[in-house]
Amino acid sequence: MQRIIFFTATLLALSQGLTAQQQKDTLQSAPADTIVPHKRSFFPLPVLGYSPEKGLEIGAAMLYSFYTSKDPLLRNSTINLIPAITTEHQLKIDLKTDIWTDANNWHFKSNLRYHDFPINFYGLGDTTRKAGATLLDNKRYKVQLEAEHRIGGHFYAGLSLLFQQDDYKARESKGVYPDMSLVDKDGGHVTFIGATGIFDNRDNQNYTRSGTWVRLNISYAPGFLSKHELWKIDGQLRHFIPISPKSTVGFNGLFNSLQGSRLPFYLLPEMGNDLMMRGYYTGRYRDQNYLAGQVEYRYFLNPKIPINIWFVHMQPKFALAAFGASGAVFNNKNIAMSHFKPSYGLGVRWFYDEGARLTMRIDYAWGEKRSGEQRQSGLYLSLAEAF
């Protein structure tokens, strides 16, 4: 697949209280549950992209941050909308909500997604080749709902629901897809019902400087609500250590597993995205299990340079980042150190909402170099941290 090059057309920071002179520096030393002024913010990020299979892609990433009450210790809530359309009549809409309420005792998340977008399918396992890619048209409907309640201290318990329907059709006859025997090759549907346990004592959920977050979700897809009876396990750990007033080291590990007698290829855990194993095309490697870990160093930077342009008045603050990771996809009978692949890169963050510690993130990452291919890499422009 031709690499998509994203170009930021413009940055519009339209937020209440964005004026830097009115904000306290809450980033360098913030204890758990830091009290900060509650301010709403809205950040739209228009982007343009081009690739031969999509043509010209026009879209935006918009994030609205707000608080559900005046409780000074309440975490901020967010609504994130990402719409995009292409000149090849393709469309995607992704809406995510992350709501905190009742003194952080209740936490609700949702994801509504529809896309009619092409993807590259490379095959199964961790030895796929770029030359074996087949371009597929993928139409997806997705509804994901999660609710968690504090049961004591820093512990939460909750329930989750995921419905997803996929349709696939090969756009070309080359590559590995036409001749592969795959479960639900043309698509299917699944409904996962799950239970979640969480430990969370982070000082802030957006740009964390100290604390730990551990999440385990076990979900079951019953046969009468899904095409196949399946089990899914998702576990993740995040731990942050402040090593100076301006610098932090974060550790992140995850494990995803899909179990059942017949496993649809499009539900298999995939390596690579803007959150973990940056530098790899999502789905370049996929298999029954996925295990990965990463370390990221962040250094807070305040150049103390005021900017006054028309109605924008700010004193921008940044963070520099360096990260490294290793991960592997594997089946139940075949895990070895040789499966693990590298990922490393550099990035910069801009705090567009200092009170809530919301950032715009730019990362460039490199992955492995397979024989006869260029080294895998990726450029990422995102709203929010990788972890």
Where are these regions (language model features)?
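Bacterial Sec-dependent N-terminal signal peptides
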Residues: M1-T26
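Gram-negative/organellar outer-membrane beta-barrel architecture
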Residues: I35-F43, G49-H189, M271, G283-R286, ...
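Structural signature of outer-membrane beta-barrel channels/translocons
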Residues: G49, S65-Y67, D98-D102, E148-R150, ...
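Solvent-exposed, glycine/polar-rich loop segments of beta-barrel outer-membrane systems
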Residues: Y177-S181, F265-M277, K333-G345
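C-terminal outer-membrane beta-barrel translocator/porin domains of Gram-negative envelope proteins
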Residues: N204-F318
